């Protein structure tokens, strides 16, 4: 049975209302009141007038080229309001019409427009067709959010009276999707393009090749997709997918119809393992390669000393460039280790022959060769800020991701720059809430407010260099985006903040008002089936779903942006009518708290289930003649998680002095071929220094104390601990057990963790490792 999305449910409900209550007065939802445009226009004046679109309204355009814009508008109104508006070409009508025209003499930027609405109708005049399109998108946002519904709704399509003069602060407003670590279907890509267009994002940066996969068909090199698009994951399953050139053309045209330029990225000279798996001879030291199944940076890269590599690069560009009519072509250029080049006689010869003093200059040489091929196709090169190292290609545009320094340096060299620093909140794969309650992510912390606050013009950049900052871009890397819904969750609503910071004048930005307008925008996202992030209730200082206490417990909750929370204490699921959370909750007895967040549109977050348990101090044990350390037993074989331990036939027994020794310390794993699959179970005692309630945290598979399984990470991608738990403990020795399984789970090798267990006494701010002087056997 297929799961209905929240948006689909809303549409069905509104459709039923439309059928059964046509003649009844409908109350306008709070989120539809007021002006809710994102991004906020440069100038907006309200009036008391309004205009209602009805079945006699016409859409008039000044030229044939504007008819596709009118059709997009008409299609929306037909689906949501059952209005079949006629599209005509001609002068602006006197009344009951929506007029869309172009005036190249408008004193605005190319994408600017003017919009006027009053009781006679709506007039949209763009500086260009781009501007007319964005004016149409603004009109849609002046209408109720339900205009985005694919089913008829019972709401008047009323446009408030306004005069708008608008243009973007920046010409480049971008969104990058990584489809290599994980894959998105053509329909999923189009869904994101629809949302980008709605909020005036005009560049789609498509990351198509990586160590983990090659995702675009190259007819001259069929093995790039035959071999390079499929990898065998750590659990033995296969993951694959690629786009045919015909599908690429379809997506590019779909984007173009919505005034979005698609920029392809073909990574070079690093992040090339999928290509090397298909054609090993492109490496410095050919061997049998496979697409990388762990994240991070691969040491094997394209050989810069082989002429055949540059012929390959030229051939690939020759096929890819014609598929993308836009000006820019992204060649990556980031995170390219130089170890193989240093050891390669051909690379060293290339350096000597061309007077290159080091491998950084060799990378610059590589990039410049690619630039020459791109210029043949009339393309301009974009690269990540590493392309600055060793000398910048003459016409290169720099995408500054490692902070702003690269962008500042490039702008000071009179090179165009696109700002996209993770430190500025523009890496949407970063956490947007407490990592202990959010789905696993790559790390970092970029809540909505931080994203919104970013200014693409660094204070350190002289004013006369501002013109080189083309704009900013949000990047969505996909290491931990295991489903298309997870792409949605990480991207929205933060991408809307990026839309506003790149369009709206800095002086007009207002986060509180943005959040108000976001209530309306989220309903629009519902209509498109977007699984956007709803802030979860969080506990300051670190969230936990199991709270032990000895006397009383007080639980305080916040959200990463202001949201209503509701809860229950009777084990029922919280609903819209459940008790609102307004003050900290106090517990004197054991109980189960269920709490969730509610949006203005009535959508609810997942439920947090928090067990609050009153405990006596669990008694310590007498341990005769305790010795330092822990007893361990180790098994080797095809083991993936704790349930696999049942098949272990033999164990090796030993001892360790610390928890970190369980896995020999944090291991540097650069390739899955060197992984030694094993499981380690450690048992012994922990010496608790004083009576108290202690909270524990670990990335190990399991942690037990007093023969109680306190933390169970089975099934989790164990990059960060998400199952912290507490227990009331008496001073003295308590039996413990922890299990660590060495495996690759969701692309993350557990060998990259520390096998330690963290502890903190209630009231302490920070965790600390259980140290060796606390461990006994």
Swiss-Prot record:
Matching SMART domains: PA14
Keywords tagged on the record: Cell outer membrane, Glycosidase, Hydrolase, Lipoprotein, Membrane, Palmitate, Signal
Broad class of the protein's primary localization: membrane
Enzyme class (EC, first level): hydrolase
Signal peptide per UniProt: 1-18
Subcellular location per the Swiss-Prot or TrEMBL entry: Cell outer membrane
GO BP: any one term: carbohydrate metabolic process
Catalytic activity entry: Hydrolysis of terminal non-reducing N-acetyl-D-hexosamine residues in N-acetyl-beta-D-hexosaminides
A UniProt-annotated Pfam family: PA14
Lipidation sites (S-diacylglycerol cysteine): 19
Molecular function terms from GO: beta-N-acetylhexosaminidase activity
Topology within the bilayer: Lipid-anchor
PROSITE patterns, alphabetized: PA14, PROKAR_LIPOPROTEIN
Lipid-carrying residues in chain (N-palmitoyl cysteine): 19
Domain PA14: 625-766
EC number from the UniProt entry: 3.2.1.52
Keyword Lipoprotein: yes
Superkingdom of the source species: Bacteria
GO cellular component: cell outer membrane
Family to which the UniProt record says this protein belongs: Belongs to the glycosyl hydrolase 20 family.
Name of the protein in question: Beta-hexosaminidase
Species of the source: Porphyromonas gingivalis (strain ATCC BAA-308 / W83)
């Amino acid at each position: 049975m297929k799961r209905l999305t929240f948006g689909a449910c809303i549409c069905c409900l509104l459709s039923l209302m439309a059928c059964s209550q046509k003649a009844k007065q409908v109350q306008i939802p709070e989120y539809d009141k007021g002006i809710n445009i994102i991004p906020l226009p440069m100038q907006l004046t309200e009036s008391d007038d309004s205009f209602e679109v009805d079945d006699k309204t016409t859409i008039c355009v000044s030229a044939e080229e504007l008819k596709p814009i009118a059709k997009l508008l008409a299609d929306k109104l037909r689906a949501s309001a059952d209005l079949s508006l006629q599209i005509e070409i001609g002068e602006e009508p006197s009344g009951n019409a929506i007029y869309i025209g172009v005036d190249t003499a408008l004193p605005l930027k190319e994408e600017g427009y003017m919009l006027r609405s009053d009781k006679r109708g709506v007039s949209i005049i763009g500086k260009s067709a781009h501007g007319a399109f964005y004016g149409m998108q603004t009109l849609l946002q002046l209408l109720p959010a339900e205009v985005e519904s694919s089913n008829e709704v019972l709401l008047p399509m009323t446009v408030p009276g306004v005069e708008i003069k608008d243009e973007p602060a920046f010409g480049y407003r971008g969104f990058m999707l990584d489809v290599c670590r994980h894959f998105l279907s053509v329909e999923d890509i189009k869904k994101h393009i629809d949302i980008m267009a709605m909020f005036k994002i005009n560049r789609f940066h498509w990351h198509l090749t990586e160590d983990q996969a090659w995702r675009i068909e190259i007819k001259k090199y069929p093995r790039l997709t035959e071999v390079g698009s499929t990898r065998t994951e750590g659990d033995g399953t296969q993951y694959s997918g690629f786009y045919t050139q015909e599908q690429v053309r379809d997506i590019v045209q779909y984007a173009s119809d919505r005034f979005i330029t698609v920029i392809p990225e073909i990574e070079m000279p690093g992040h090339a393992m999928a290509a090397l798996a298909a054609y090993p001879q492109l490496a410095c030291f050919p061997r049998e390669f496979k697409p990388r199944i762990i994240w991070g940076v691969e040491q094997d890269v394209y050989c810069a000393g082989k002429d055949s590599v540059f012929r390959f690069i030229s051939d690939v560009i020759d096929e890819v460039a014609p598929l993308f009519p836009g000006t820019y072509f992204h060649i990556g250029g980031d995170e390219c280790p130089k170890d193989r080049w240093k050891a390669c006689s051909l690379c060293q010869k290339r350096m000597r022959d061309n007077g290159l003093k080091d491998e950084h200059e060799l990378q610059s040489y590589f990039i410049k060769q690619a630039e020459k091929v791109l210029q043949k196709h009339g393309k301009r090169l974009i690269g990540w800020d590493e392309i600055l190292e060793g000398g910048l290609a003459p016409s290169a545009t720099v995408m500054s991701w490692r902070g702003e320094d690269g962008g500042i340096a490039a702008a000071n060299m009179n090179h165009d720059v696109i700002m996209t620093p993770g430190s500025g909140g523009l890496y949407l794969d970063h956490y947007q809430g407490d990592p202990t309650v959010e789905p696993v992510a790559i790390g970092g912390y970029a809540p909505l407010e931080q994203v919104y606050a970013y200014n693409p013009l660094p204070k350190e950049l002289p004013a006369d260099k501002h013109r080189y900052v083309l704009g900013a871009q949000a990047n969505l890397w996909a290491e931990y985006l295991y489903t298309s819904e997870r792409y949605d969750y990480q991207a929205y609503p933060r991408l809307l903040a990026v839309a506003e910071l790149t369009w709206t004048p800095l002086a007009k930005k207002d986060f509180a008002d943005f959040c108000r307008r976001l209530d309306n925008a989220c309903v629009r996202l519902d209509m498109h089936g977007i699984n956007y992030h709803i802030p979860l209730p969080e506990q300051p200082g670190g969230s936990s779903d199991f709270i032990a206490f000895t006397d009383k417990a007080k639980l305080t909750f916040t959200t990463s942006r202001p949201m209503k929370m509701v809860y229950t204490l009777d084990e029922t699921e919280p609903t819209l009518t459940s008790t609102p959370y307004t003050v900290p909750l106090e517990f004197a007895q054991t109980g189960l708290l269920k709490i969730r967040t509610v949006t203005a549109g009535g959508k609810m977050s997942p439920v947090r289930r928090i067990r609050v348990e009153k405990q006596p101090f669990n008694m310590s044990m007498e341990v005769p003649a305790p010795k330092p350390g822990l007893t361990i037993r180790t098994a080797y074989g095809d083991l993936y998680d704790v349930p696999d331990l049942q098949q272990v036939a033999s164990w090796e027994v030993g001892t360790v002095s610390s928890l970190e020794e369980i896995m020999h310390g944090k291991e540097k794993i650069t390739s899955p071929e060197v992984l030694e699959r094993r499981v380690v179970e450690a048992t012994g005692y922990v010496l608790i220094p004083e009576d108290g309630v202690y909270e524990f945290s670990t990335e190990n598979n399991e942690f037990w104390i007093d023969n109680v399984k306190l933390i169970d990470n089975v099934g989790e991608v164990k990059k960060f601990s998400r199952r912290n738990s507490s227990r009331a403990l008496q001073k003295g020795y308590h039996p413990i057990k922890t299990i660590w399984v060495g495996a690759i789970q969701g692309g993350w090798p557990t060998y990259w963790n520390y096998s330690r267990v963290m502890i903190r006494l209630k009231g302490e701010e920070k965790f600390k490792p259980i140290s060796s002087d606390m461990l006994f056997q």
